[in-house]
Amino acid sequence: MMLHIPGVLTNAQVAQCRELLDAADWVDGNATSGAQSALAKRNRQLPEGSPVARAVGDAIQDALARHALFFSAALPLKVFPPLFNRYAGGETFGTHVDNAIRLLRGTDFRVRSDLSATLFLAEPDAYDGGELCVEDTYGVHRAKLPAGDLVLYPASSLHHVTPVTRGERVASFFWIQSMVRDDGDRTLLFQLDTQIQALSAEKGAKDPMVISLTGIYHNLLRKWADA
């Protein structure tokens, strides 16, 4: 499931993040690449351990923790600290698949990459190109979202970023280990939760059907979750 999650950051928060990011020192994006990605990746990136990356990453994680739609869709168990990249002057990232396990350098913190996320930090009209293209059995899905919005998709997906031919594309990217590892199971839970919320808004939280469906949701989560 590929999902657009709007409003993770406000316009003011995006501006604060960009002020810090634009003043930071960036390095070749292959600093974090696997063997396959290094052949396809042409961009710049903040070093993982930089104070700016940590500060902006913490702000993003705080925002994610408050975002109900993100939690419902991802059911996060662990979130890899957000990383940051930028593309300009024809820079691109060819077709690749993300590594299954991400290790935070200098620590024993590991994340199984069930989900990949890109949080856009530049407005779509600020650059040409730079679309995130995610492939699945139904074709290629493209994302170029407003600043502050996030796209979430299975980390097992082949994906690429088209060349940026004007302006600059700035984004954060990171991976999530979900409590529910299977994408199909996780999608069913998200769909069920969405319907429960809609029914609750219509009939009230004390409605017998809402209570029954909520019980089914939690029993399925209990069956499938690792916590």
Swiss-Prot record:
One of its GO terms (molecular function) is 2-oxoglutarate-dependent dioxygenase activity. 2-oxoglutarate binds at residue 169. It is an enzyme of class 1 (oxidoreductase). It comes from the Bacteria. One of its GO terms (biological process) is intracellular iron ion homeostasis. Disulfide bonds: none annotated. Residues 78-178 form the Fe2OG dioxygenase domain. Its cofactor is Fe(2+); L-ascorbate. Fe cation binds at residues 96, 98, 159. Its EC number is 1.14.11.-. Keywords: Dioxygenase, Iron, Metal-binding, Oxidoreductase, Vitamin C. Binds 1 Fe(2+) ion per subunit. InterPro entries: Oxoglu/Fe-dep_dioxygenase_dom, PKHD_C, PKHD_hydroxylase, Pro_4_hyd_alph, Pro_4_hyd_alph_FE2OG_OXY. PANTHER family: PKHD-TYPE HYDROXYLASE YBIX (PTHR41536:SF1). This is PKHD-type hydroxylase BamMC406_4714.
